[in-house]
């Protein structure tokens, strides 16, 4: 829908009377029909209240009308004054757009020049009559209608419901001459007239005709009733979002605030919670920055004079082709040919010589030239350029057009131009001469620039960079990034004026903004710097719960931004971590296979308006005509990114409790060393004694021979007198343990003294002493012998083992080298995976490179187009750029959405592999690596996960002939119970083996399940009936045959290989290298196994000396002291217990003695009866 870029003044009229532009009489009609619904007080700033019903207010359009929907448009809805009038007969007189002639304004009022006068008619259904007069600079124009096809009919305007057909005309009076022009048929019901200051006339929202500039309007109703009233409003144009219902305005939103601008951009009255792209409001009028190279200037003026005279006199058609035309090009000589510019600079100038032509005017249009006559002065460059009033072969024509009241147009001549591309001649706005360079730069502000003939819009800043070569610096997409002042050598950078921001919307309010610069125009007070952007809000940054999440951060209800951690999940029970040794058969090999799965991609949000228009205001206005094109593109990217973020957040979780328990070194705050059992020695006895025994006894640790000490202790049972009787024999030699306690020493000392005391009579008493001494010496001697033998064995075995160890470690070194090379190959493969992951960046580069394409426009720079062409012709060229760039954006969005779909499928596959490969052992062959799965480890990788699958790969196969079961005597059937078992025959014997690993064994009855019989029953059906049993079955041949009948005739397109643009991941060479390295590693492993066997053959079988712990009891006097102390303590306790209190032993005894001495009678007690009721 074409949007007219004008502002309007609204005039709703009911009953009033004015004289000379002033209302002379009117009254407020509170009883008028619909008064309360149509009259309101204008809010501050000229805004219409949100609860206004907009009865009989229509959306203005130059073409077709919108029936239902939401439209963003410039409409006359910013009111400068509003008043209501009523009466039997009213005439407004002339009401001017500057406010002259207006009544008492209701609510807000302003004296600014309004753009529209609008009449809203609140009459009853009966017909009213009136006229409308327009005052223009060339005379008075009357708009009227008649039910006669002839102009001479009854001239008036019927208001209300019209019966019959009425035809409308415009009478124009210039001087003494009056002419009429037919403008159209009047609608059956008239509810609104709108007249703009530029002469556009609307009825019920539709433009009927154009007059040219209008100064004032006089609205006259001659047959009004007392119940009729009107409202008069003066209004200006405003950017609004309009909800249209049945061609009438239902409600509006002014696009004047941050949230309202966002609503207008989204074409929605309610914006869902989320993140949205936007750009700060930019001023329409921008300063101009110009930089040129030092050149020698010579200047020429190209001046075009246009003069004409309309037809005049009696019987002449004053609005027909002019009677006389005189067009002159200064310094042009028709005999010498075209006027060519032979200087370095020139300036074009259009001079209108005509005068007193009334509503006539003339102008020079662009025609089929790629530039306008006046716009070549905006530093447009040529190699050569020539002008002529005669046709130039190979040139273009600029028509000179005269128009009457902008309604009738006549071509009165043409200016012909011939040019060639180059930079030798430049059009300039002002003449310059001599050697000079021009530099007028506005720094640190948004500016329109022309730098070394490159036009655009941006912010120019002084840069610290230093480049020796070049004077302009561009990106791969052709955008100007910076330039050098050739006279001073200073480098300047150029950045976009308004980098797009991301606004955070929650509950219909903007609570935060993500900015590319540390500057906010959204009214936020707190700005924090984050690694990749600035974030502005009014939040307190002390919240913990995010209401919106995006990627790895979230936003709270007050606008505070926080980091979003993975979801913390907790389970009631945690499985213990169990490890076990796996036995691998010799005909299998172990392989670790690497697999990469992408689970996420970097979210991309493209600001459509910035990408297409790069901040050009006029381009942004044209872009709005594409309605929801940008909204669709941005919504697709934004919603896909949010869905991606939600899926990743749902996938990545952690259990803090499980993470803690997985660390075996800590189990919370508990020290588990007290519950760890001691290691047992022989039998069920435990090595070590209790803590009390360690306190009461002194412990001595020695080394013993074999089981001598254990057998000795078992024999003596702790009795010292059994020491010699329990002597042990080691290799036929009697031995006793080398440690003797004090009791044994006392016993043998007494034996020795007794043998010496009486000489020969008691010498036999010392025999036990001598035997014990000799046995203990034998114990020591044998220990020394065992140590010497062990030393010889160790010396021989160590020398033999060293050679094998050196060879083994040499092999290990070779294996590590080959493993390193294999891992290098894996790294190469991962680099190629990274290239696939980086294709998103390639897509962005391709998207930005499309900005260099002009899409059949004269330039890829929007500002350059507007500098060279008139507005209408420039709009046509920019429209091509908009269409092309939107198409490029759509291709990019399609590619991005396809990538999102692929990543989502990959993420789901990664989730399955984590559950099946990492958390458990997969039974699916080839799912967790190409082999039989053992276990898998997962590691994080850029934008994905890397799985290291440990699998078994078979190296040898056993071919067998398997059966599904057995049939005994033709009656009894048996089938295998487990589906992973196979029954086969080997020679004359039947065996069962696992299908996973060849482990033949003799079958048992537990392996079989008996079935009813040996019969195998089949159901005989036709092919057409198969799909009734198996719905998923598809007859491929039949389907292809049916498709072949339906295919139309076609021609195979000629697609060359260069048109196939798809990333191919070629890992063939790397896989072959990995296979070769794997074979070399397998050979090295076998060699290492041989060396390990050699090392095992050198194991030393030593005669171990046992570690013996002997507890030595304390001497007798220690026990005596302990007994004395215990007796004393017990005596004192008994004394205290028996001698204190009335019930003590001695007190009871004394009372008994006294009773015997005094009397044997018990004391008498009186008994008194007590009756209890």
Swiss-Prot record:
Task: Supply one GO BP term.
Answer: endocytosis involved in viral entry into host cell
Impact of altering residue 210 to S? In strain: Isolate A162
Return the motif ranges for KxHxx: 1169-1173
Phenotype for residue 530 to M: In strain: Isolate A162
One cellular component GO annotation, for this chain's record?
virion membrane
* Residue ranges, Virion surface side: 16-1115
Record-annotated membrane-spanning stretches: 1116-1135
Result, substituting residue 230 to L: In strain: Isolate LRI 281
Q: What is this protein called?
A: Spike glycoprotein
Instruction: Please report the organism this UniProt entry assigns to the protein.
Output: Human coronavirus 229E
